[in-house]
Amino acid sequence: MMAKPKKTIPAKLSDERIVIYDKDGISRLNEKRYGELHENFLSLSYVEALYLVAKDWVLIRDKKNKILSFEELHEIAHVIDKKLCIRYLVYKDLRNRGYTVRTGLKYGSDFRLYERSNIDEVHSKYLVKVFSEEIPCEISEITGFVRVAHSVRKELVIAIVDADGSVVYYNMGYLKL
């Protein structure tokens, strides 16, 4: 006999994030390391929300109470974040591989990445910076990311998304000779 699927978690579109007030939904998502927990709600980034909508875990309503499809949410989010497409592909790939992925904004990166084996870790091991194969990047820019990652005792992972949406990861750092 198949287990009864859990109910879809209701969420609301806020100005620059998705907000969940449903206590059961907050508990379920927080347990799986999604979102940022606040006193009486859980907030999701657009990338997290897109991932959860694609999996039918959340149902997002806009300010007029209209249910947003994946495509509609993507369109709204893309206005705010021009790198949304490639960030989403990397987020989805890492989550599907079993990693816990959090925003890396305060480190100047796209994501913080936690080891799969220890999701209760307080500190992430990696910072992930996302690039498109189609847009050139200066080596000085990458050097700056390596320097920041090193200064906060994290390893830098460069995620490059190609035209087909495939992701390749490179570990960047200092080499002591």
Swiss-Prot record:
Catalysed reaction, written as an equation: pretRNA = a 3'-half-tRNA molecule with a 5'-OH end + a 5'-half-tRNA molecule with a 2',3'-cyclic phosphate end + an intron with a 2',3'-cyclic phosphate and a 5'-hydroxyl terminus
GO MF terms listed in the record are:
lyase activity; nucleic acid binding; tRNA-intron endonuclease activity
Going by the UniProt record, its keywords in alphabetical order are: Lyase, tRNA processing
Catalytic positions?
Y114, H123, K154
GO BP annotation list: tRNA splicing, via endonucleolytic cleavage and ligation
Task: Report the domain of life of the source organism.
Answer: Archaea
Q: Which enzyme type, at the first EC level? A: lyase
Tell me which EC number(s) this protein carries: 4.6.1.16
Pfam families, alphabetized: tRNA_int_endo, tRNA_int_endo_N
State if Lyase is listed as a keyword: yes
| SUPFAM superfamilies attached to this UniProt entry | tRNA-intron endonuclease catalytic domain-like (SSF53032), tRNA-intron endonuclease N-terminal domain-like (SSF55267)
Q: Which InterPro entries match?
A: tRNA_endonuc-like_dom_sf, tRNA_intron_Endo_cat-like_sf, tRNA_intron_Endonuc_cat-like, tRNA_intron_Endonuc_N, tRNA_intron_Endonuc_N_sf, tRNA_splic, tRNA_splic_arch_short
The Gene Ontology CC terms held by the record are:
cytoplasm
Q: What does this protein do?
A: Endonuclease that removes tRNA introns. Cleaves pre-tRNA at the 5'- and 3'-splice sites to release the intron. The products are an intron and two tRNA half-molecules bearing 2',3' cyclic phosphate and 5'-OH termini. Recognizes a pseudosymmetric substrate in which 2 bulged loops of 3 bases are separated by a stem of 4 bp.
Which family does the UniProt entry place this protein in? Belongs to the tRNA-intron endonuclease family. Archaeal short subfamily.
The record's subunit annotation is: Homotetramer; although the tetramer contains four active sites, only two participate in the cleavage. Therefore, it should be considered as a dimer of dimers.
Kindly provide the name given to this protein in its UniProt entry: tRNA-splicing endonuclease
Organism in which the protein naturally occurs:
Methanococcus vannielii (strain ATCC 35089 / DSM 1224 / JCM 13029 / OCM 148 / SB)
Q: Which gene encodes it?
A: endA
